[in-house]
UniProtKB/Swiss-Prot annotation:
Signal peptide: none annotated. Keywords: Chloroplast, Plastid, Ribonucleoprotein, Ribosomal protein, RNA-binding, rRNA-binding. Disulfide bonds: none annotated. The gene is rps12-B. The keyword Ion transport does not apply. Its main location: plastid. Part of the 30S ribosomal subunit. InterPro entries: NA-bd_OB-fold, Ribosomal_uS12, Ribosomal_uS12_bac. This is Small ribosomal subunit protein uS12cy. With S4 and S5 plays an important role in translational accuracy. Located at the interface of the 30S and 50S subunits. GO terms for molecular function: rRNA binding; structural constituent of ribosome.
Length: 135
C-alpha cells in the first residue's frame, strides 16, 4: 500500500485496454486486397506456392492470405472452410479472431462477401461460411 506522499509523487496509472486486433482500428470489419494467397499441396512446394503449417501437436496445411487493409496495415488472415477462390488482387472483408495453432494469424476472412464466395455444399453452420439456405 503506497503512502500519501508516494501517491502525490506518482499517481496511479489506469489499466490500459490492449486490443487483440489493432489493424481493424476499432471497426468490426475492414475491407482489404489480397497481396498473396498461401495454399498448395505437401508434395508441390514451388516458388509462388507456400503453405502455413500449424504448431506442434497439430498437422495440416492451413489456407491463409496476406491482405492489405484500407487502414494501411498488411496482415495475415485465415480463410475458413473447405475450398476457396481467393487469388491475388481479390477484395475481401476481414474480421477479428485468431487461429490458435497458427502463430501470428489474428484475423479471419469473411466468406460470402465481396470476392470471397461461400463454402460449396455446406449444410450446417452456414452463417459462418456465407451459404444461403438450401431450397
Amino acid at each position: 500500500m503506497p503512502t500519501i506522499k508516494q501517491l502525490i509523487r506518482n499517481t496511479r496509472q489506469p489499466i490500459r485496454n490492449v486490443t487483440k486486433s489493432p489493424a481493424l482500428g476499432g471497426c468490426p470489419q475492414r475491407r482489404g486486397t489480397c497481396t498473396r494467397v498461401y495454399s498448395g499441396s505437401k508434395g508441390d512446394l514451388s516458388v509462388n506456392f507456400s503453405t502455413i503449417t500449424p504448431k506442434k501437436p497439430n498437422s495440416a496445411l492451413r489456407k491463409v492470405a496476406r491482405v492489405r487493409l484500407t487502414s494501411g496495415f498488411e496482415i495475415t488472415a485465415y480463410i475458413p472452410g473447405i475450398g476457396h477462390n481467393s487469388q491475388e488482387h481479390s477484395v475481401v472483408l476481414v474480421r477479428g479472431g485468431r487461429v490458435k495453432d497458427l502463430p501470428g494469424v489474428r484475423y479471419h476472412i469473411v466468406r460470402g462477401t465481396l470476392d470471397a464466395v461461400g463454402v460449396k455444399d455446406r449444410q450446417q453452420g452456414r452463417s459462418q461460411y456465407g451459404v444461403k439456405k438450401p431450397k
